[in-house]
Amino acid sequence: MQNRSFHVKSYGCQMNIYDSQKIISMLESKGLKNELEPKSADLVIFNTCNIREKAAHKLYSDIGRVNKLGLKKTIAVVGCVAQAENSEMFRKNKSIDIVLGPQSYHLLPKMLDDLENNYKQINTDFIVNEKFDYLSEQMRPQGVSSMVTIQEGCDKFCSFCVVPYTSCLLYTSPSPRDLVLSRMPSSA
């Protein structure tokens, strides 16, 4: 996995943009190079949002565009569309190699290693506390401000909303104050 390059495309909410930054930091810490364009990357990661149906259609169109480049790419679909569609994604588009729910991002490096054994990879478990513990260590502050996730999900189950089903039930970091303090620069 050391010599690989990757590109991340984010759809949807601010949380997805933040999660994409965490994925980028995690993969860079493993020696992978972040590319600005999918054509330059070995691995293309689509971080998806399932709030609007149009996002899923856009995802499949974008995967088609990557396939038209004519180069073999590893394609990972992560986020809420991956959670909602689960293994059905492999049937809808045969070029998808990894399907990863929003609470399993931290497993991506291992899944990439396992993929080298020619097995398509899927993980849509709700293992929220592991993600919080692992990914909080991966982020580097950028500039004078930084995002810190202290809570994710929702437990309200509104009839019109998919968040509890595709993101997770409400989860709050066990020690939000400590998490915020640990992310502050020592000179603050």
Regions found by a protein language model. Name each.
Residues 1-173, 177-178:
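Proteins enriched for Cys/Gly/acidic motifs involved in redox and nucleic-acid/cofactor modification
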Residues 174-178, 182-188:
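Positively charged, low-complexity/disordered segments
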